[in-house]
Amino acid sequence: MTHLTASKPIGCWHQGESSPEPLDAAVENALLNVGRPIYVVDRQGGFAVSQTGTAELGRRSTGDDGTLPLHAYAPPLHPEALGDPVFKRTHGLQYAYVAGEMANGITSVRMVMEAGRAGMVGFFGAGGLMPTEVEEAVDRLQRAEPRIPFGVNLIHSPGNPELEMALAEMFLGKEVRLVSASAFVEPTLPLAYYRLKGIRRDADGRVVCPNRLVGKVSRSEVARKFLSPPSARHVGRLVDSGLLSREEAALATTVPLVEDLTAEADSGGHTDNRPAITLLPTMIALRDELAAAHGYAKPPCVGLGGGIATPQAAAAAFAMGAGYVLTGSINQCCVEAGTSEAVCSMLAEAGQADVTMAPAADMFELGVKVQVLKRGTMFPQRAAKLHELYTTYGSYDQIPAKQREALERDIFRCTFDEEWEQTRRFFIAREPKQVERAEKDPKHKMALVFRSYLGRSSTWATGGEPTRKIDYQIWCGPAMGAFNQWAKGSPLEKPENRRTVAVAMNLLFGAAVATRATWLRSQGIPLPGAAGSIRPMELADIRKRLGESPTPSI
């Protein structure tokens, strides 16, 4: 029996259909019954737990009225209750949970559909795909029955603003109402166009903005621009070009550029490796500052992504004020992910230290890096070598002969001219301007060839190309290792058992359990060490637990 500590009674408890049980024996099961209240009472000089009966806060138990002193109370906490209700209402969700976009269709149509059917939302990973491929994915998602909430990613293309605008126009034409903007260092014209097109006042005079843009940022200076109204410069250009009406432009100052903002901490892919514990409070404070300054009728919700891989991480995010949580790396190892079994197996063996930063294909010349898996692949080292050569030499011919031989033998597996011809065909189809420039600028030609290796390394991975396994580029953050450690010995240990909804519900259910354990501890109740820390469960077992939800009395 756990004996009373300095905890003082907060009220009295009237016994229900069952007697309280000793805390050490009953509290872990009680915490799992998240749909039922937990009462911790003084019974014969020790703490005991019940999930029935009624409580009266502030009333002292006299001992002769059939009551027991109440020392702590934890209300029911269904996973549906986690997060910001405004976020869930705005997007038509049951849970404040987002399956974040991973490029090249890794966050696949199938994954987005599964998330939507479960009351969550997923963003299709459109980055790196042709507009026709993105349009096909949108068509499939819009044909889903029943209709589901879904979003699509718009990734920053600093060297190809025409692609950004083409995608924005396609989203508007297809009436895609939810778009995630990622890897942006500042707002661009296509983002403002997507956000503001169709803005109007309803019959009651309220501003209606049909297109919801969710920004994903790591830096406060970028967040400030996303949380502010679209810039007057962009609005003016859109009006002058006839893309916005003057009526739409007049309402531009009434809304922030983004409907919601994801604070992106130490994530896979594009990341600034920010610590979540400092990033999220900063972003929330910035939101509050700008919402007050601009008088928004509906301030943006701020969520957290990057490192969300265990129930404790999700619980911590919600406790810090996250309106929602966003997952990425851990979804890549789910059966619905648009990647290969080989990648899933590699990810399932990763530890938290098995990641590193490597040059990014889409922003190679700028020196931008992405976080990738380093275990089982030589991509990080080879990509770093290519960037070193690019910054050192003015053309491929200037690279010493022995190094060129090594590149053509180990990385290209063909001559430079053959590699260039393949690269040229790729860019002719996507960005002809790049080819024109490369034929005049040998350094740019070298950059495009090096970028070609970086770009194809990710498609080799998603396609499971066996002859290129040593070159796989697998976007991954330390969250993957944390998830693997948590899942060890559970139904989710093997990648073939990892399904998007099962992973999500384990995180949310576990977060609810962990949160209630924290509530009890904060009231002075000394819980057993493992209380509140659960292992992954079968989805059916979670649903069974969630079915136990009588209405409490207090």
Regions picked out by a protein language model, each given a short descriptive name:
Residues 301-309, 327:
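Glycine-rich beta-strand-to-loop/alpha-helix junction loops that act as flexible
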Residues 286, 336-341, 347-359, 367-394, ...:
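Helix-termini ("caps") and immediately adjacent flexible loops/tails
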Residues 160, 167, 171-182, 353-374:
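Phosphate/diphosphate-binding loops
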Residues 2-299, 312, 329-331, 458-554:
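Active-site entrance/lid segments in N-terminal catalytic domains of soluble metabolic enzymes
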Residues 171-179, 196-206, 231, 343-355, ...:
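Short secondary-structure transition/capping segments
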Residues 131-135, 266, 312-371:
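Catalytic or ion-translocation cores adjacent to nucleophile or general acid/base/metal-coordination motifs
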Residues 374-443:
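C-terminal catalytic or substrate-handling cores of phosphate/nucleotide-
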Residues 424-471:
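Glycine-rich phosphate/diphosphate-binding loops and the adjacent beta-loop-alpha structural elements
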